[in-house]
Every structure is written in structure tokens, then in C-alpha cells.
Amino acid sequence: MSLYNYKLKPVDELTFTDDGMFQAVLHEPDICAELVERLLHVAVDFVAYPEIEKQIAPYFSTKGVRLDVYLKDQNKIIDIEMQSYPQRSIGKRTRYYQSMIDIDALMKGEPYPSLKDSYILFICKEDPFFDYDLNPYNLPCYTFRNICEENPDVDLNDKTVKVIYNASAYKKEKDSSIRDFLYFINTNDPGKDDFSNRLSETVKRIKTNEKFRSDYAAMNLHDWDITQLAKNDGAKEATERNARNLFKNGVSKEIIAKSLNLSLEELDEILKEAS
């Protein structure tokens, strides 16, 4: 979602794939475990609640990351992300998330040989991968591991896996349980699948929860404030850039100030900063 197109979606219109609702549903441990076991084919032995929108910012001066749903047990760490709008740089995003997850573990005193198995799971409503002619590859699932190009039998064994599901290609999925889930993600219709119906009923129940409704409103008010700041910052930068370019091209200060709705003092300050 572009910050400039940000629009609050009413609680009663939320679906499982919407930001806020997705995290709320997967905060329930049994649902989260079943989703992981269905999509990753790995057993989960955690008992604690999954962490929702986990913040990882290892250094004060560095950009952190906010993970949708983060859970771990004795042997593995799993990050689950819902992607309900097109994502063109998903590969670099998984790379960044992986680095933050590892740094978070290392800074808590875990030696790197003891790093847990790591899974980054993306559930996408649209295909994130295209060929050179911009045609989607149209696979229902993409699984990435680090192997040797010269000999695929040689595994780097770094214990990291990235799994990316494309719900728009649900018809091509051979596993019926995954196909039913991807159909639900793509259409919001749970069909006859027990797990998808359970997700759908959980969404309905959460919508009636007053705490969720107030938290969702507060979250969106915060996001709206960020959007306005981004708009203001973007407009300010554009004005300053246009002022400098016009001045370089010989336009008088009076005309620049008038056309950009600036005082001469403000314009002088902009030009002084650029010199």
C-alpha cells in the first residue's frame, strides 16, 4: 500500500488477509501452529503466544523491521508475512528480514553455530515473480534454499528456508489442504475446508471484540499520522527541489516565490542550504 493512497478500512469490512486482522487471528497459538504445519510441513512445539508485529531494531541508529507474526520453539524460528498487495522486491525483503532475525538472536548471546533453523513464510495474494517479459511464473509455491550451483547435491546447510505462496495460482496446487487454503486467501470464501472455515469464524468473532476494535482504530490513527507526515515531508522536498531548479535556470526569485507560494525569506533560506 502506498502511503499516499492510505485509506482506513472499516473493522466490519476486514478479512483474514487485512493488516491487523491477520495478526489478530494468528495470535491464537493453535491456529498459528496449524497454519505453519499445513504450509511448511514442520511440527511446532511452542506453547507461548506468537509475537505479533515483533519489532527488531538492533541498533538505535539503524532501520528496524516489523514482522507480522513471529514464533519460535526449541529448534526453529518462523516469520509469517501476509502480502495482500503487489510486492516487487520480495527477494531483498526476505534477505533483510533474515539478517534482522539472525542479528536479534546473536545480540541475545546466542553463538552463531547455535542459530536455530529459520523459516520465512510469505502468503501473497498475487504472484510476486515475473519473467523478463513481465509474465508471472504462476506457481502456487516457491521454495528457496541455498545450494551449490556447480553441484545441487551440495547444500550450504545454513538452515534457512524462504517459502512464498501465490494464492492466485491455487488451482495448480496439488496438495488439497493447501489448495483449499489458497482458495480462501484468493477469494475470502472458506468453501468446505475445515481450517479455512475456522479462520473465517475467528475473523467474525474478532470483529465483535471491543478491545480489537479500539486497538485497530488506534493503530490506523497512528498510520494516518505517519501518512500525513510523509505527505508533508514529500511536498516540502518537492518544493525545495523545484525552487533550486528554477533558480539554476535563471528564473527570478520573485517569480519562484510567487509560483511556489513562498516568501522571499523562505526562498533565500532554501537557496542558501543548497549553496
Annotate the PLM regions:
Residues 2-12, 16, 20, 39, ...:
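Short, charged alpha-helical interaction segments and adjacent helix-coil junctions
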Residues 1-161, 171, 225:
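Accessory alpha/beta interaction modules
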Residues 157-175, 180-187:
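Upstream accessory/linker segments immediately N-terminal to the RecA-like ATPase cores of bacterial MutS
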